Amino acid sequence: MMPFDIRVGQGYDVHALVPGRKLILGGVEIPHDRGLLGHSDADALLHAVTDALFGAAALGDIGRHFPDTDAQFAGADSRVLLREAARRVREAGYEIGNVDATVIAQAPKLAPHIGAMVANLAEDLGIARGRCNVKAKTNEKLGFEGRQEGIVAQAAVLLWRASVGDAQD
């Protein structure tokens, strides 16, 4: 038995850019002529982090907990979903160590908004800002991201808990 149960989770999300929607990433509304299409607010960054949390705790994925077939999640604020995911992960006995995420978008430039995204992640997860990181990358005009047809987000999280027995409980 290890003295600590340490878990790593990986999350991924992608949404199409379409006219007539707000662009929300990391809980921040970003000025742009298009937004992300989805059942909720389509915040790809928070969805990737949420998926990484559930994965690390072996609790399934975002679709299992917040299905896009459930009307109660139509237009949902992804910050609310992230806070609930963090609550469920803690309920399972885990603490959140850190989060590292990457958003891949050709446009708009995301660098001016990274600080606000990190602040939202830290607040929603109940951890220090220094334990949250968000990076923005372009796809060098390659693929659907480069053609500005959509935005991708990837996230990794570290969870831990002091082991008192089998991690399969």
Curated annotation (Swiss-Prot):
Please list the residues that bind 4-CDP-2-C-methyl-D-erythritol 2-phosphate: 13-15, 39-40, 61-63, 66-70, 144, 147
**Which InterPro entries does the record match to this protein?**
MECDP_synthase, MECDP_synthase_CS, MECDP_synthase_sf
Q: In the record, what lineage is assigned to the organism producing the protein?
A: Bacteria, Pseudomonadati, Pseudomonadota, Betaproteobacteria, Burkholderiales
Which SUPFAM superfamilies does this UniProt record tie to the protein?
IpsF-like (SSF69765)
User: Which cofactors, if any, are listed as required?
Assistant: a divalent metal cation
Domain of life here? Bacteria
Q: Which Gene3D superfamilies match?
A: 2-C-methyl-D-erythritol 2,4-cyclodiphosphate synthase
What family does the database annotate? Belongs to the IspF family.
* Residues spanning the signal sequence: none
Q: Which pathway does the database say it acts in?
A: Isoprenoid biosynthesis; isopentenyl diphosphate biosynthesis via DXP pathway; isopentenyl diphosphate from 1-deoxy-D-xylulose 5-phosphate: step 4/6
- Reported function: Involved in the biosynthesis of isopentenyl diphosphate (IPP) and dimethylallyl diphosphate (DMAPP), two major building blocks of isoprenoid compounds. Catalyzes the conversion of 4-diphosphocytidyl-2-C-methyl-D-erythritol 2-phosphate (CDP-ME2P) to 2-C-methyl-D-erythritol 2,4-cyclodiphosphate (ME-CPP) with a corresponding release of cytidine 5-monophosphate (CMP).
Q: Which residues bind a divalent metal cation?
A: D13, H15, H47
Could you tell me what reaction this enzyme catalyses? 4-CDP-2-C-methyl-D-erythritol 2-phosphate = 2-C-methyl-D-erythritol 2,4-cyclic diphosphate + CMP
Protein name from the UniProt record: 2-C-methyl-D-erythritol 2,4-cyclodiphosphate synthase
| Record GO terms (molecular function) | 2-C-methyl-D-erythritol 2,4-cyclodiphosphate synthase activity; metal ion binding
How the cofactor is bound: the record states:
Binds 1 divalent metal cation per subunit.
The EC class name is: lyase
One GO biological process term: terpenoid biosynthetic process
Which Pfam families has this protein been placed in? YgbB
